[in-house]
Amino acid sequence: MFTEICGKLRTCIYKKVAFSRPLGCNLRQLPVFRDFHNSVSCLRENDKALDELNATILRLQRRIDASKSISLQQKQTQEFPRNEKLLSFLLDNTLRSNVSDKETHSVPPKSKSVLPSEDNILVQRLGVPETSFNKYFQLEPTAESISHKSVLAPEVWKSRLDNLFRYSVPFEKCNLNQVIELVTHLPSSFRASYAKNILDCLKQVCLTPSVYLLNILLHASAKHSTLEETLNVYNAYNQFQLKPDNYTFVSLIIAYSLHKQIVKAFSLLSEMKRLKIEANTHVFNTYIAILYHERLYEQAWRLFDYMKFKSLQSQPDDKTYSYMISVCTAERKVEKALNLYQEMQERPINPLTPSSRTIDAILRALARYPRYHSKFWSIFEELRAEQWKPGAQTFVAFAQLFSYGGQVNSLKRWISRIWSMSGETPDAKTIELLFQYLFRAYSNVKFNQEPSLEQVPNEKTGDDASISSPSNQLSLKLPFLLSSSSGDITKEELIHEAKECYHYLQQYHPTVLSVHLRTTYMSIFKNHGCMDEVKEFYAKSFRPAKLPSSHVVSNQNETTCNKDLPFRDIHVYACAINGASVSNDFAFGYAVWLEYLHCKSYLPEVLNGDKIEFEITKSMIILFARNQFLHLAVKLLNETKDRHWKWTRRSLGIMHKVAFLSQDKPALDLIEEIVLD
């Protein structure tokens, strides 16, 4: 009888305490379990105590039954999904996801009828009326609440957090669950700015944070705070005697990489080894992402091979293959990207099904090169037959496809569809991206070839008719929707259309006219040999590169209009010099090059800056050679031969021809010395 009663009591205590235990707390560590085990020896030979214990069990059972009935009523009225693993979701009316996306954490119930009034003390101190708690914190399990998006404006959040931390003991009478709930609803930037306050307040009331809470604060600090502030949050793990996990180190890796300390980011592997934490796939994926963004492709491949052939706990997943396909795209190795896409599906152990992330990566890789466009359509048709649903990045892949292929008509219809999809004007970032692709398509149109077969997936005549109808209010805001989208386009019509699109942006969306978008627009004239338009646009749509104030000569005649223009960057200079080289306009090209040399050391750093500088040098050598300034070409080549650029016979072909015709032996010897066989 004793064993049976003890078993019943243990079960009741588990059921009773499991609803209210703090996050990360082991049930056996609770006082009720310690008291239970300490009292077992006293109960073995005491019949009266056994009777009292049996009565206690009955009372506990009645309370559990009452709790079950309340939970059942809430479930019937709110229609939550039935899943025993999400018991906290059913009881608490909200879903909390760990950063690992694999664990769920229970939090206290939120309805006023369940929580005692003193449990809402954090809400009161924030200055939020208790009846409006759901409104401000999105306690209903919507998609936004699951992703921790806040409905409050930043200034409102700051005001309410100031109200909270104005108290002498802000977290007095609060438990850890309530603090975690507050932090998960904070915008990421506020988690970072108030991380120190939150940790200090936890120490003030002797509350030990969980690793989950510290990971949230550390991840936000890594993205929004200084490196010193991030490391201060990391020190809290030692202060509270908590062991970091893989996701702790992912945040530290991100922090070091954002502050350009790549070596320190990789040295964290030694720290993980010291703490006996085995790096998982998520950690290595973060490293590969850093190597990809830093253009350290060889190291990314070495790490990928380690994951494949040596590591047992960090096998490549779908995200790993997505990054490596992007690496192949950056290296212009499309065949290798296709091999990876095939490998992940056919590997003998644990084959992977491509997700939208991987599919979009391979489609973007194929879209950049017209010779692979047939393969693009082949993969897309296979996916469409399998009822695959494209995502937002798939629209970008199609825009790239039409843009790099110079398929203007298809791209116009595609942009029209995206534009009218939501029934309202897209945001500025989307508009800039769409017109970036459109201007590139205008640049890539080839007039002296047979027209390619332009196709748009799921194209319906009815949809196009509704989009291009003059009665459609959106269509009146797009200059190309009312124009014909069939038949070949002439060079004059293309230039006219491009100018209309640019004037449309000037009138309706002037804020999207960035330096990058203006440069792409200027490349339309450059690629089609319209150097007069290039010169005019170069002079009127940019200002010379920004110099330090000590190098600037004040110009009283500079108008307010000119002050609103963007400064030229290396992309602008490269586009203008390349255009001058192709059209052999020495006066314009040489003037732009001199301005570039004057401003070169003050230009902002850009991605692939060394590659762009190489293109500028090649264009100027061609321009010098064509205009019989061979000594200037030799001088420029001598000055840059230590840059480890890959010179070929083709890139120096014109210079070699001029040197050969003029029998300039030093120039010929220099070319032979520098050219890679």
UniProtKB/Swiss-Prot annotation:
Keywords of this entry: Mitochondrion, mRNA processing, mRNA splicing, Repeat, Transit peptide
GO biological process, one term: RNA splicing
GO cellular component terms attached to this protein's record: mitochondrion
Positions of PPR repeats: 210-244, 245-279, 280-314, 317-351, 355-390, 569-604
Top-level lineage group: Eukaryota
Keyword Zinc: no
Any single Pfam family the record assigns to this protein: PPR_2
Subcellular location: Mitochondrion
Transit sequence range: 1-43
Subunit structure: Binds to mitochondrial small subunit 15S rRNA.
Family: Belongs to the CCM1 family.
Function: Regulates mitochondrial small subunit maturation by controlling 15S rRNA 5'-end processing. Localizes to the 5' precursor of the 15S rRNA in a position that is subsequently occupied by mS47 in the mature yeast mtSSU. Uses structure and sequence-specific RNA recognition, binding to a single-stranded region of the precursor and specifically recognizing bases -6 to -1. The exchange of Ccm1 for mS47 is coupled to the irreversible removal of precursor rRNA that is accompanied by conformational changes of the mitoribosomal proteins uS5m and mS26.
Note: Involved in mitochondrial-nuclear incompatibility, a major determinant in reproductive isolation between species, through hybrid incompatibility of Ccm1 and its interacting partner 15S rRNA between yeast species.
PANTHER family in UniProt: OS03G0856100 PROTEIN, OS12G0638900 PROTEIN
Protein name: Mitochondrial 15S rRNA processing factor ppr3
Organism from which the protein derives: Schizosaccharomyces japonicus (strain yFS275 / FY16936) (Fission yeast)
Gene name tied to this protein: dmr1
